Amino acid sequence: MYLEDTIAAIGTPVGEGGIGIIRVSGPDVPAIARRIVRRVNENGDFVSHRFYYGTVVDPESRDTVDEVMAVLMRAPRSFTREDVLEIQCHGGYLVTRRVLDAVLQCGARPAEPGEFTRRAFLNGRIDLVQAEAVIDVIRSKTEAALNLAQHQREGRLSERLKAVQGCLRHSLALVEAFIDFPDDEVDPASRVEIEAKAREASGRIEELLEGFDEGRVLRDGVSVLIAGKPNVGKSSLLNTLLQEKRAIVTSVPGTTRDIIEEVVNVRGLPLRMLDTAGIRETEDVVEQEGVRLTLEKIPQADLILFVLDGSRPFDDDDRMILAALAERRVIVVTNKSDLPVTLRIPGELEGVHTVAISTATGAGIDDLREAVFETFIHGRAIDSREYVALSQTRHRDALVKARGRIAVFFANLAAGNDLEILAVDLRDALDAVGEVTGETTPDDILELIFQRFCIGK
């Protein structure tokens, strides 16, 4: 990647649409704009951030390519902090390709995936946390996930990380001051200040780490597998949660043979719901394969909804399923609460969260949604504008490393080890936090991060 060249890409999805957008960034943008954008009733230089109506013309033949709106944004007042040209043309595969080709004929090169965002990062407009949040904004499936991503894109998580870095730099500056003046002893007041700032940094890191599990599930969603014997209402439960008829429901046992997957939004938490084949002993070869797939999926799920028929006794098929759920996160769902209750919950399930529902009447469904939500989001106000959380494993791992280096610092401080050793510990902690924000992130990790982006972003 060369920041001194000019890049271009189509910034809208391929296919028919109302408009297509071609983005161009780099030093040749003003020359490209003058060469291919023919403005109506306008002459002279482009005024920054003003929309112009006109046409894009082929740079060689001067034939009209399309009717467009175009805006040139002068550096540094653009997304990449470079000169940027955005051309809005008619949507469609061929016309957007022709406009892009006109730009490329003027010397621009095709952009790599995520290269516009990468330039914004390398030019200091955003840090790496904000860059990663851009793709999370695009891929968000719920309002809560979008809010979390937007908060990160706006820099709220970055502000908390800067506060951690500020504490560590404060401690490090004091330590290095005494290293520079070896004749001076570390006085008690300075030692207290060094220790206090390091503890504050550690506490701030701990607060961020505590919110990781919730941030991760908001970003990535969780897999929830509906398990149970045939005809207990698993498919009816999926349809009820979806509020549409997605799975076939009949009175014939074994109707569901394959795994059906759908996404359900529960208060902003994306649930990947898996409706599975009823688990039982069977001679049917196809049904056996469905049971095998279900048992294979159980260990991979984040949560199991173990559905029981409240109007029938707990039997051997239920017990076989219970054995497969050992050490899994489970909510017991007793369906058919509108019928006389015959089921007795076995002792092995005592203490497991149980919700009584009726898919026929809808009773208890809101209670079930709340139980699933609280399993992953422990009372936090995820819809609050103040909600900020870690959501990337990369961030969590780097902060765990930073916390570990601070712990080593305290051990060396207590042992009375040399100031140089204490300084190394604090620098290592700072470097670990810098891996999150991009200040010390290795190039190979940067490559992996920006490869996840689409071309044009």
UniProtKB/Swiss-Prot annotation:
Chain sites annotated for binding Mg(2+): S235, T256
Co-factor remark: Binds 1 potassium ion per subunit.
Binding site for GTP: 231-236, 250-256, 275-278
Domain TrmE-type G, first and last residues per copy: 221-377
Binding sites annotated in the UniProt record for K(+): N231, T250, V252, T255
Cofactor(s) in the UniProt record: K(+)
Keywords linked to the UniProt accession: Cytoplasm, GTP-binding, Hydrolase, Magnesium, Metal-binding, Nucleotide-binding, Potassium, tRNA processing
Annotated EC: 3.6.-.-
Binding of (6S)-5-formyl-5,6,7,8-tetrahydrofolate, residues: R23, E86, R125, K457
UniProt-annotated location(s): Cytoplasm
Signal sequence extent: none
NCBIfam families listed in its UniProt record: mnmE_trmE_thdF, PRK05291.1-3, small_GTP
PANTHER family with a match to the protein in the record: TRNA MODIFICATION GTPASE GTPBP3, TRNA MODIFICATION GTPASE GTPBP3, MITOCHONDRIAL
Function per UniProt: Exhibits a very high intrinsic GTPase hydrolysis rate. Involved in the addition of a carboxymethylaminomethyl (cmnm) group at the wobble position (U34) of certain tRNAs, forming tRNA-cmnm(5)s(2)U34.
The name this protein goes by in its record: tRNA modification GTPase MnmE
Organism for this UniProt entry: Geobacter metallireducens (strain ATCC 53774 / DSM 7210 / GS-15)
